[in-house]
Amino acid sequence: MTTVTTLRTAHTADLTPTELAAARALMDLAFDGDFSDEDWDHGLGGVHALVHDAEGELLAHGSVVQRRVLHNGRSLRVGYVEAVATRPDRQRQGLGGQVMGALEDVVERAYDLGVLSPSEEGEKLYRAHGWQTWTGLVGTLGPQGVTEMPDEDAPMIWGADLDPAHALLIDWRDGDVF
C-alpha cells in the first residue's frame, strides 16, 4: 500500500502557529519527551521541511538554520540541521529521507556545508545521505573566547572536504552547542 504524502519547505516566519505547534508536538512524540524547549528553539529561524499525509497530518519534520564555524582560518556559513523527526508509527518508510533530501537541497544552494549532531537512531539515515562523522577536534567560539570540547560527541558534516587536522569551532549558543 502506498500512502500519498506531500513535502513542503517553508521558513519559520511562513509557518502558522498551528503548523509550528504540530511540529513541536511531533518532536515530543518522536523523542519520547526528551526534546527540550531549548532544543526546539535551536530549530527555529530557518527553513523547515514538512511531510504531510493526504489528510494534512504532519508525519515528518526537519529544519536547517544558519550558523558559523571557524576552520583553518576561515569563517564558513553552515546550514545546521535540527529537529529531524518522523512519527514513530511511520518510521522506516522513507519520510526522513524526504526531509533530509529537502534540507540538503537548501544546504547545497545556500551554505558552505551542512553540520548536524546525530542521535544514535538517526545516524544511519544521515550516513545513507553521505554525511560523514567529523574526525578532528571540535570547540566553540563564545563569550569567553575559544573553548575546546574534547568530550563532545562528534558532529557530522556534509558537502565539504575539510581537513580534520584543524579544529572545527562552531558559534556558541545556549544549551547544546552542537
Task: Name what the model sees in each region.
Residues 2-15, 108, 120-178:
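Terminal substrate-recognition subdomain of acyl/acetyltransferases
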Residues 9-85:
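A conserved beta-strand-loop-helix scaffold within acyl/acetyltransferase catalytic domains
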Residues 22, 102, 121:
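Short Gly/charged-rich anion-binding patches and loops
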Residues 53-56, 89, 159-163:
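Short loop segments at secondary-structure junctions
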Residues 64-66, 99-103, 137-142:
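Short acidic (Asp/Glu) patches
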Residues 81-91, 121:
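A short, internal acetyl-CoA/4′-phosphopantetheine-binding micro-motif in the GNAT/acyltransferase core
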Residues 89-102:
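Conserved acetyl-CoA pyrophosphate-binding loop and the N-cap/start of the following alpha-helix
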Residues 105-119:
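Conserved GNAT acetyl-CoA-binding A-motif
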